[in-house]
Regions:
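C-terminal portion of ABC ATPase nucleotide-binding domains
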Residues: 2-4, 536, 544, 553, ...
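An intracellular "coupling" helix at the cytosolic face of ABC transporter transmembrane type-1 domains
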Residues: 26-33, 125-126, 142-151, 155, ...
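Cytoplasmic coupling helices
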Residues: 99-118, 132, 159-160, 183-227, ...
């Protein structure tokens, strides 16, 4: 187990309050000093707020004991005005701090969300296949919601709860040492009892989160395949499945609800008992000592006892909320754990001015039991700006090589050499320079423009340039709304080739800043004439980029500088088109695709 994984395990064992605070601190980033500043403002505001009960007690005692002259009346009026001053001071500091807290919470939420998305996008395809998208979405949404709620709304509550408890106890110690000790001891027992129950509830919250993750995964499946559900008349089946996934959490939810209500009943009764006992004690001792029971002193005791009791009780409620939030944050730890396994291989790039890259002894299998190698001891070399073609029959390994180069799958063996020098974590660094444009177009239910730009800022010149490169300009021109046309709008019907060209525009735009562009038959459904023009456009506009293309139609080969011939996961021949024309396996492949004249 790595040090990072051990830290993750330690976080799971920590008190929820500490863990949630550490999570906020981690994602505060450059705003940590600002966090300390507004927490100090909350401290001043909370301290000022505590003075209200004390001042009211003084007012009552003043009226009861010494209200016999104008000077004493003026003193009374001054103390009454103190209540207004306290409120003004409170809002001066509290209001400022709340604004800073809310704005900081926004940035904490942003940092957390970006962190999780970065990690998810860096994880290999195998992880994504093993972890349902709906489950992952639910974990991220719950985690970011928990972090946002705590950092925007809960930190000031925590500060005031601690101030109300310890500030009130300090004042009670000054009023009567015995009462202060009793209140501290009694309240501590209440808090321990409530937190013990919450520790048990934490287990139920984690279970309920898991049930929710699975439910979200099912809902995601059914809604993302709604056409299949409707056409196969699966509405009742789907409803039953959703209901069964809901009902499976009922027993846990029932236990959590009953225990939770018992906890609140216990806390409320215990706090009231503490207050009653202290007030009886104070009234009894004052009466027998002086014959006078001061209303103000009783009010001060009652006010601060109630504040302490309410604060402990509220702390129990607050702790329960934090246990829920912490459980949601912990739910996303599986993403962190998976990322830690690849962290060391993620960062870093090849030299900016690299000239030649060589792949040596690359091995790969989809079979975890290693019964079959899908790629075996593959060796490839390419220069910056070179145009490479990968040819071979279906299943020969062309697409697999491209997927590994882009980092979709980790190879089981192999090294990367850059300008003759071996590169540590070479495949992870190589993928940072690559854009892969796949064969199957993924079209979103949105406008043509959205499908191209993914709603990212894009210069109009770039947009038009790549539309022309992909031979998609005529398609856009025939649509009444042009780029603003929704692909699923009534009357809009894109053919398979047009959908491929739409996806190709998006891929070429994304490849603008990449050194290496991989084409995995992205024009397989495009007619031969447009396919030829597309490749000519790509090679003309991407002169300084390396283009490696898996192609099915071999009439394009005269456009490439170098060719690799694949068969059953191995490279069986390589060279220029002129050189490969002498190879009998290559001749056979050309004849098979009806290009007999090309090899004669």
């Amino acid at each position: 187990m790595s040090n990072k994984e051990e830290k993750t395990q330690e976080r799971r064992k920590k008190n929820p309050i500490i863990n949630v605070l550490k999570t906020e601190w981690e994602f505060l980033g450059s705003r940590r000093k600002l966090f300390l500043f507004y927490m100090f403002l909350f401290f001043i505001a909370g301290t000022a707020g505590l003075m209200t009960t004390l001042v009211i007690g003084w007012i009552f005692n003043s009226i009861q004991q010494t209200m016999t002259s104008d000077s004493e009346l003026r003193k009374l009026i001054f103390m009454i005005f103190l209540l207004l001053a306290i409120k003004i001071i409170f809002w001066m500091f509290h209001g400022t701090a709340r604004i800073l807290e809310s704005l900081t919470g926004f940035h904490v939420h942003k940092n957390y969300t970006n962190n999780k998305m970065y990690k998810i996008l860096e994880l290999p395809v195998k992880w994504h296949k093993d972890n349902h998208s709906g489950d992952t979405i639910d974990k991220v949404n719950r985690g970011r919601g928990a972090v946002e709620n705590f950092s925007s709304y809960y930190t000031f509550e925590l500060m005031y709860l601690l101030l109300n408890i310890f500030g009130s106890l300090i004042i009670l110690f000054f009023v009567d040492l015995k009462i202060g000790i009793f209140a501290l001891t009694f309240s501590s027992f209440i808090l321990v009892g409530v937190m013990t129950v919450d520790k048990k509830l934490r287990k139920y919250y984690l279970q309920l989160n898991k049930f929710s993750n699975k439910l979200s995964a099912s809902i995601f499946d059914y809604l993302s395949n709604i056409i299949t559900v409707i056409t196969l008349r699966l509405r009742k089946t789907v409803s039953k499945e959703i209901d069964s996934r809901l009902i499976v959490s009922y027993d846990t939810y029932k236990k959590e609800t009953i225990i939770n209500e018992f906890k609140w009943a216990f806390g409320s009764i215990a706090i009231t008992l503490m207050t009653v006992l202290v007030l009886i004690y104070q009234a009894y001792t004052n009466y027998h000592a002086t014959g006078i029971i001061l209303i103000g002193t009783l009010y001060i005791l009652y006010g601060y006892l109630r504040t302490v009791g309410d604060a402990f009780f509220e702390f129990g409620r607050f702790y329960g909320k934090l246990v829920k939030l912490n459980a949601r944050i912990e739910g996303a730890y599986s993403i962190d754990d998976a990322f830690e396994k690849v962290r060391g291989r993620v960062n870093g790039k090849l030299p900016y001015n690299w000239k030649e890259i060589e792949i040596k002894n690359m091995n790969f299998t989809y079979d975890e039991e290693w019964k079959r190698n899908h790629l075996e001891n593959l060796n490839m070399k390419f220069r910056r700006g070179q145009k490479i073609a990968l040819v071979g029959e279906s299943g020969s390994g062309k697409s697999t090589v491209l997927a590994i180069m882009r980092g979709l799958y980790p190879p089981q063996g192999g090294e990367i050499y850059c300008d003759g020098e071996k590169v540590r974590n070479g495949f992870m660094k190589l993928k940072q320079h690559i854009t892969l444009i796949p064969q199957d177009p993924e079209i979103f239910n949105n406008t043509i423009k959205y499908n191209i730009t993914m709603d990212l800022p894009t210069r109009k010149d770039d947009l038009n340039k790549f539309i022309e490169m992909a031979q998609f300009k005529k398609v856009v021109a025939r649509l009444e709304k042009g780029l603003d046309t929704n692909v699923l709008e009534k009357g809009v019907s894109l053919s398979g080739g047009e959908k491929q060209r739409l996806a190709l525009v998006r891929g070429l735009l994304a490849a603008k800043n990449s050194d290496i562009v991989l084409l995995d038959e992205p024009t397989s459904s495009v007619d031969s004439l447009n396919e030829m023009k597309i490749h000519e456009n790509i090679f003309r506009n991407f002169k300084n980029k390396t283009v490696i293309s898996s192609i099915h139609r071999l009439h394009l080969l005269n456009k490439f500088d170098y060719i690799y011939l694949f068969d059953r996961g191995k490279i069986i021949a390589e060279g220029t088109l002129a050189e490969l024309r002498k190879n009998y396996r290559f001749k056979y492949l050309m004849k098979k695709y009806g290009l007999r004249k090309e090899v004669e």
